[in-house]
């Protein structure tokens, strides 16, 4: 038994050695990044995370438990499962088909995938600032240059600054949160249209908070 314990100890890697390996192999710019901060929401309504502070009614919990028990959760979902979900979303939103629908595990994953899709040498991603922190984080992790364009003091879009930045940097991807996070305001629709017309790259209108604004 003593030999086994000695082998286990010899095979263990100390936290200090792991930290040294991380420092040696992980990109320096990634090491300098700050983690996404989640504030304490005790006794608060988390509008920023779109969380309901109240639990589901007992009857609905029981119904969900029955449906979950009937699923083969030991298997990955099939393509048909995703198709059915897309069709349900298309019906709900009045879409003609499902070809334009992409599903993700929350917006963070979709933002990350979009940043990776445009990650070519010299590519640039742009967004107003301040805005959702994951736009810049997704760009940095993908190794793509990020250009923040400051909002006006009243948090409205600086249309001239945005158009000038678009002309200068020719971004492959522009993120516009509508309504904006964390400022909570809707940008002027004419300003948004001007950005759409001026950009030859992809423009993402992030409408995660549209329910608070009475629609898109």
Regions found by a protein language model. Name each.
Residues 2-14:
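Intrinsically disordered, low-complexity terminal tails and inter-domain linkers enriched
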Residues 14-108, 113:
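N-terminal small-domain helix-loop-helix segment of the aminotransferase-like
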Residues 47, 203-204:
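Residue-level marker for buried hydrophobic side chains located in beta-strands
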Residues 72-198, 204, 209-216:
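Conserved core of the PLP fold type I
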